[in-house]
Amino acid sequence: KDLIQEGKIKAWGISEVNEDYLRRAHAICPVTVIQNRYSMMARWHEHLIDVCQELRITYIAFSSLANGALTGAYHSQADFKDDQQDFRRNMPQYSQTGMIKTNALLEVISQVAKKYHATNAQISLAWMLYKFPHLIPIPGSRKVDRLSSNFQAGNIQLLETDIQMIDHQLEQMEFEVFGGH
């Protein structure tokens, strides 16, 4: 708080925060931004989005494509075997069991993507932006064309019926995903 008052910093944020810690920290010095995992497959912090709106805090969602799983580009941990530095090699969403669960969701996303002539990633991001317009997703991208494609998700206006269908399916699904609680 002193650093803000002295003009040494303009704002501050917290990463991977829970509601109790956020409220306690915010009471001492108003938090400007939080950064937590959030995607169709990782929704355990969803209640924090409402808390952030209540407290006027920006929510930045990292891993918004579940470390690439929601793109449909990867099919198993073997997709990462040639890159020993790629930490996704050990993520549960790419295990045999994890991929079965992920593929069930990808079927739903692909169905909607075809309707909008969009990619799976674009639909995943458009869903997130529709539900929480004040949330800022930061999908990781290693290639410029994917970055550009992801950016176009903001131009996709999903219909309420598509959102309801996706949400209905998500309510019936459980995922094995990195960072899960």
Spell out what each predicted region is.
Residues 1-180:
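Beta/alpha (TIM)-barrel catalytic core signal, keyed to glycine-rich beta->alpha loops juxtaposed to Asp/Glu
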